[in-house]
């Protein structure tokens, strides 16, 4: 998210055939229509409000609003929380084109609300949050980070894990008997983000859609190199140091 440099802030197209990857809402309106049925059920039991976190191109928001209109269950407000100014502009353009008569129901937030009732929606958000790369070694648990080598190129570097990361890694390593040499990811950011809603959501539900595994499969010994993956122009690879800032870097959800 670094201004002008970060993947989500540099202005290049991310989604669709001209971008790096395709999400379900970009492929068909059926995804939004299906999600709308569940959103309607939740709103009828809580409040007619929606917050979508990380709304991408705005395609899902537009499809949801149109389907909820058809179901006669429009939200009083559809809020979008997105850190990228570039994506905010694209979301406004998408909704204005697809559902101009519903644009006045949409607002953009700069931070999480203190309290909220309704539906919190996030499609492929958690796998885009920062994750720590962890290595279990013979002599301890290490946090893998980035350094610059003698040639001036980015390379992996390790330092002993500490604090909350070490505690989480120790618990996982013990629970699943991870052998030395096992490497994987732990997203403290995803854990913290999810926990925040336990304090802020007074009535409603979180609807989180993403790629991932149950924890016992995420840390299975057949997945000893982790799940970190990069996407560039619809090609997947595992080198986060290639074309820095131009690749979508993701890790599956635990």
Language-model region placement:
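Rossmann-like AdoMet
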Residues: 1-53, 57-116, 134
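Class I S-adenosyl-L-methionine
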Residues: 107, 113-254
